[in-house]
Amino acid sequence: MDDKINKLKEIIKNSNNIVFFGGAGVSTESGIPDFRSANGLFNEKLNITFTPEQLVSHSFFERYPEEFFNFYKAKLIYPNSKPNDAHIALAKLEEMGKLKAIVTQNIDGLHQMAGSKNVFELHGSVLRNYCVDCHTFYDEKFILESKGVPKCTKCGGIVKPDVVLYEEPLDDNVIRGAIDAISKADTLIIGGTSLVVYPAAGLINYYFRGKNLVLINKSSTQADSKADLVINDSIGKVLGKVID
């Protein structure tokens, strides 16, 4: 393991345009579980068990807003979570001028809380919420303190989290920014993701000019064979050792 850590240190030292692509594994170390590991919910009224994927779909939000928000508040918002060693190390790399962008599948805002500035949030953020009718902004606290379905204080419309639900497209501007950053990178570090969620996982295909592809994940991924360095360990532990 020490050999791999030293190799990663060497790669970082010789890189000037690093991009980090991260998934749920980055945030699990801050106590935020991957929502896909959540149990499905049984709806007694309908006599149906919904999967986590169904519960955070656009059609479920439209048809059963109350049930959507019950699940959303219980399983997707973690207001007491703090950045871990991975978030802090990445913010330091940006401060050093090495890291140029973070592309994340997470919606918790922990990268920004750690100090990272150039973050492309592919799936949005729980910290931003907007009225579906008049587009008034509301913060995470408003959602958590709302009883039942959050309603706009100005017009009474439903306040929807600015997160990309299943059946919804990703934001074009975010995608363009992420592709631009990845395609220009000299080193791409992929961490805390098994690369199975599309279209997000497909973005790594835009990395074809760089010198170093690094994969840090507890389990193996489909991209391991293409990588110059694979470390099967905790992302926080690895990055914490690299940026000490």
Curated annotation (Swiss-Prot):
**Where does it sit, as one GO cellular component term?**
cytoplasm
Subcellular localization(s) per the UniProt record: Cytoplasm
Q: What class of enzyme is it?
A: transferase
Q: Where are the transmembrane segments?
A: none
Q: Which molecular function term from Gene Ontology is one that the record holds?
A: zinc ion binding
InterPro entries attached to this UniProt entry? DHS-like_NAD/FAD-binding_dom, NAD-dep_sirtuin_deacylases, Sirtuin, Sirtuin_cat_small_dom_sf, Sirtuin_class_U, Ssirtuin_cat_dom
Q: What is its EC number?
A: 2.3.1.286
Q: Does the keyword Transferase apply?
A: yes
Any one Pfam family match given in the protein's UniProt record, by short name = SIR2
PROSITE patterns linked to this entry: SIRTUIN
Signal peptide (residue range): none
Lineage, broadest ranks: Bacteria, Bacillati, Bacillota, Clostridia, Eubacteriales
**Catalytic activity, as annotated:** N(6)-acetyl-L-lysyl-[protein] + NAD(+) + H2O = 2''-O-acetyl-ADP-D-ribose + nicotinamide + L-lysyl-[protein]
State the organism named in the record: Clostridium perfringens (strain 13 / Type A)
What the entry lists under SUPFAM superfamilies is as follows:
DHS-like NAD/FAD-binding domain
Task: Name the positions where nicotinamide binds.
Answer: F35, I107, D108
UniProt keywords (A-Z) are: Cytoplasm, Metal-binding, NAD, Transferase, Zinc
| Residues that, per the record, bind Zn(2+) | C131, C134, C152, C155
The catalytic residues are H123 (proton acceptor)
Q: What is its main location?
A: cytoplasm
Role played: NAD-dependent protein deacetylase which modulates the activities of several enzymes which are inactive in their acetylated form.
Which residue numbers delimit the Deacetylase sirtuin-type domain?
A: 1-244
Positions of NAD(+) binding: A24, T28, F35, R36, Q105, I107, D108, H123, T193, S194, N217, I235
> How and how many cofactors are bound, per the record note?
Binds 1 zinc ion per subunit.
Name any cofactors this protein relies on: Zn(2+)
Superkingdom, taxonomy of origin: Bacteria
Q: Which family does it belong to?
A: Belongs to the sirtuin family. Class U subfamily.
The molecule here is called NAD-dependent protein deacetylase
